[in-house]
Amino acid sequence: LGKLQKAISCFQKAIEIQSNHAGAYNNLGNVFRELEESKKAIGYYEKAIQINPNHAGAYNNLGNALKDLGEHKKAISCYEKAIQINPNHSGAYNNLGNVFRELEESKKALGYYEKAIQINPNHTYAYNNLGNVFKDLGEHKKAISYFQKTNSIVSKEELLKYSYLLDGLEDYKKKLEKFVEKETCNRNVAAMAAYVSKKENIKNIYPFCKDPLNFVSIKNLKNVLTLTDNFSKNLLKRLETVHSIWEPKTTTTKGGYQTLINLFNTTDIEILKLQKIIEKQIIIYRKVYERSEDYFIKKWPHKCKFSAWYVKLLKQGHQKPHMHAQGWLSGVFYIKVPKLLNKYEGSIKFLLSSYDFPEDKNLPNLIHSPNDFDLVLFPSSLIHQTIPFNSQDRRHSIAFDLIPK
């Protein structure tokens, strides 16, 4: 955070010296977007464009910030404007592909990714994105061929997954051994390794978090911290003023609303109070597991940042199985949950699985039916989901990740 604040000061000084410095405004936008303050970033990108209407980079960056906020149509217009100014802007073509993939328009996405590669044959992201689209379409041989074209962590994750699904256990074990030599804390691979080791009854050699279900912590904070119903009312009142989106395309939320900005980038008293509570509980959590040899605990990052979001689920609302690959530790604080539900309705379910792997009902899982003021902490490599519920009441929660810097 210190370096980013210094960068902000430098760019502001540049503008103080030269008020029409479009590049400085664009760079300020980049810093605020990195700080997950996309609304602020948008203002700076727009100022850069106002000064220099031919600033293709600012249009591309503005598109990214708008996409962060779920403004897909506006983002598309910005990327198209960037390309109009600079027809060889491979990044804008790649970003157009990302938008159309989110909108589930795979054919359009393919065309834009291919164009990005045509302009820049070394565009790693575009190759990975092409692989992901073909994977979405079930064209696995094509997906593999694109993942093989790069040496990125993402492509290695996908090829490791395919080795188990298509080539069998022995090939997977060889590839995992090679992966461990270079990367020991990849959350996607940790999820995969935990699943395969249990399913195949073999030793889990991936050191990040070998048995993640053992690291789920559930604590009700109402009595521990004398939280009151007034606290939750004030918190909900504040959260209702934050812009949220129905079933955002980039999330697993179905039948509900979710915010896309980082809630913890705020000066709001109630939200900051909750953040401080969570920080203290994480210290306690680490103390509980301090003797673990798993790298999840042993190699806990020295510098982290929070990312938090609010989820409001309605009747039949749920979240599909997912994990938080960018996080280290993840969690949920339940503000207010529906009452009188049937067994497991509205519960959070933890399971040993990985993206693209089918759930194996013979493998262990953990289901928790939350109460108001419950705090649940767990490794970010652990797949989880919310089970649908039938109540007319709303289910209010704040989810968060602790992310290594």
Where in this protein do the model-derived segments appear?
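Catalytic core of non-heme Fe(II) oxygenases with the double-stranded beta-helix
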Residues: 269-272, 276-279, 283-377, 385-405
